[in-house]
């Protein structure tokens, strides 16, 4: 199988496409690496430095479904047919893919199969499901600026999974944990006004060590 960047480039730019494409057509690229590639494709619009608007919530729901199936140890991915048949303008999809290809190629330059237990073991898939599911929920939170970083972590984790690269997958999961802490702080500030987890930790350290 060709690298994912090449598959996407061929599909969207070297073959004639109609005015619209649907999710099922794009997911046909995935073949045997369905779980990882689906995570990459669904997180990409929100993971871009300038995110494509309108995708975080619906794709977040689908990513959460993927995460549940990872935790359950499913070998075949199930997504609702009604969602698979939803269409997007080909020109819009091409714009998203074009913006994401440079990032994908950078990761491909350093990726290769290693640490297979992270991607293939039951425990590894459970941990992936937990971190990806948590980030999918974060993507759906209607607070400005809370979509991009969770989507980036899902993108990295999914990329590592489809490359069978346990190092990159593990990095994506660690990134997810760090983002989770940040997201809790952001949500706390949003609802309580101005006090972050960092401020709370500083106060706690002052009490513990007698700082001023």
UniProtKB/Swiss-Prot annotation:
Record-stated family: To R.meliloti ExoD.
Keyword Transmembrane helix carried by entry: yes
GO CC annotation terms, alphabetical: plasma membrane
Name of the molecule in the record: Uncharacterized protein slr1875
Location relative to the cell: Cell membrane
Top-rank lineage group of the source organism: Bacteria
Entry's transmembrane regions: 34-54, 59-79, 126-146, 171-191
Annotated PANTHER family: EXOPOLYSACCHARIDE SYNTHESIS PROTEIN
Topology term for the membrane: Multi-pass membrane protein
InterPro entries, A to Z: ExoD
Top-level taxonomy: Bacteria, Bacillati, Cyanobacteriota, Cyanophyceae, Synechococcales
